Regions:
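Membrane-interface helix-boundary motifs at transmembrane edges
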Residues: 93-94, 156-163, 247-249
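Transmembrane helix boundary and interhelical loop/hinge segments in multi-pass membrane proteins
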Residues: 50, 67-88, 92
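Amphipathic cytosolic juxtamembrane alpha-helices at the membrane-cytosol interface
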Residues: 89-101
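Terminal transmembrane helical anchor/hairpin motif
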Residues: 39-49, 167, 172-253
Length: 253
């Protein structure tokens, strides 16, 4: 398994995803600067930069980034490569697992670097006091809450093999997430996990407005449930995807 991971890692060093890892954190900071500049000074006890970082950004930009990460690493495998891999008796399931591990690691790196840059900008340029524990919890939720979309993207792309369709699909499915996130059906819609989990952590409604202290959306139990669901969905869909890859490798001619 280690050899599969090393192979995928070597491919990524020369790929578009390497450039994304550099560009996305910069976009993250510029996006926050633009949004905060438009909104002005944060209300007492609230933070516009937290709202833009952990609500608007996951809603507007992150789904596209996740789609690009997946299609870039999966789209490298052309038909001639698959024939060669089959002739060498390589495991398609292990290759898929290696790709998942690499993308999850890249996603974690992007989110952590973006958060550090945002914290630095907010602290030294905006003079905001952001709770470090709150920031760490929000970062964890954003990362884990993105895992279901990552693994579903791998599954969908493996079935349709169309980059544009996957990107468009993730973009479209993100739009109802803010509405679904405030209903009991949010647990059935992985694209809403981030918005729902982060609401009590950063005090922001899924629609982007600030929450009152007594709001039912401030219940942290929902965050813990979302973390569990995200990991569970990721594990189940990943297992399903690996089984499909394993079956296809046996049937491949």
């Amino acid at each position: 398994m280690i050899s599969y991971i090393k192979t995928e890692l070597m491919k990524e060093k020369r790929s578009a995803n390497f450039k994304l890892g550099i560009i996305v954190p910069i976009i993250f900071v510029l996006f926050n600067i633009a949004m905060v500049s438009l909104m002005g000074k944060s209300p007492e006890g609230k933070s516009y930069i937290l709202a833009t970082s952990f609500n608007w950004y996951p809603f507007l930009i992150l789904p596209i980034v996740l789609s690009l990460l997946v299609v870039n690493i999966s789209g490298k495998e052309k038909s001639e490569h698959i024939v060669l891999q089959k002739s060498k008796n390589l495991s398609f399931a292990k290759m898929e697992l290696a790709k998942n591990i690499i993308i999850v690691a890249e996603l974690l790196t992007i989110i952590v670097v973006s958060t550090i840059l945002m914290f630095t900008f907010a602290t030294f340029f905006l003079g905001e006091r952001i709770s470090l524990s709150q920031l760490i919890m929000a970062t964890i939720c954003l990362f884990i809450g993105s895992l279901p979309v990552v693994v579903l993207s791998f599954l969908i792309y493996g079935l349709i093999k169309k980059k544009a369709i996957l990107i468009l699909l993730n973009f479209v499915l993100t739009f109802p997430s803010a509405v679904i996130a405030v209903t009991n059906n949010w647990i059935l819609f992985p694209w809403s996990y981030n918005l729902r989990m982060l609401s009590p952590v950063v005090g922001v409604h899924p629609n982007g407005t600030f929450l009152d202290t007594g709001s039912e959306l401030m219940n942290m139990e929902t965050t813990y449930l979302g973390l569990f669901l995200s990991i569970a969905v990721y594990a189940v869909v990943l297992t399903l995807n690996l089984l499909i890859k394993n079956k296809r490798s046996k049937c491949f001619v």
